[in-house]
Amino acid sequence: MIRVLIADDHKIVRDGLKRILAGTSDLEVAAEAASGDEALALVKANDYDVAMLDMSMPGLAGIELVKRLKAEKPKMKMLVLSMHGEHQYAARALKAGASGYLTKDSASEQLVTALRKIAAGGVHLSDAAAASLVQAGTSAHQSLSDREFEVLRLLVAGLGPTDIGQRLHLSVKTVSTHKSRIFDPENAGSQPPGA
């Protein structure tokens, strides 16, 4: 059973997300939070497989919340839900430690697919976020090293860092470094020694 924490400041949204997950046999809403601070307190006290986070809550939220949760529970996966489809939001969320990014206009089925995929170690982007990243990155991908491009291709295919490392004969740390470089435009294309 995949234990999910839902963090959204709108009760009606949390209730809708709970209804969607109630229709599955492998996803369980283990807790819900109405703020980023509440989510952080819950994560400190409990273990969850995936945290679903609203990008735009008042107070602690967005990229800072992702970073704080990642620092607290590095193995917990995070799916960011947002009304923003622009590539900057998705890229920053992934760089901060999220494993997935969905716009709130995504279909229910895509939410369930995303949760399962990232719980298994993969990465998931909504169609809108992926399209925006591709459009923004049409020339950006050309600045990636061959190895970074290969890591990106496998991330998009849904593989997690461990699987990518095994496939490319790299350590998980090296894969994570490549992932950081891919989603940080200032570092894209700069190769570490020996890569």
Q: Across the structure, where does each feature detected by a protein language model lie?
A:
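Acidic, metal-coordinating helix/loop segments flanking the phosphotransfer/catalytic sites
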Residues: 32-50
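Basic, Lys/Arg-enriched C-terminal extension of HTH/homeodomain DNA-binding domains
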Residues: 39, 180-195
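Active-site residues of response regulator receiver
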Residues: 8, 54, 82
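Short amphipathic alpha-helix used as the core "switch/output" element in two-component signaling
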Residues: 41, 63-75
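The short loop immediately C-terminal to the conserved phospho-acceptor aspartate in CheY-like receiver
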Residues: 49-51, 55-56, 77
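Helix-turn-helix DNA-binding segment
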Residues: 134-180
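Short, flexible helix-to-coil linker/hinge segments that flank and couple to helix-turn-helix
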Residues: 88-95, 99-152, 191-194
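Acidic catalytic/metal-coordinating carboxylates
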Residues: 35-38, 58-64
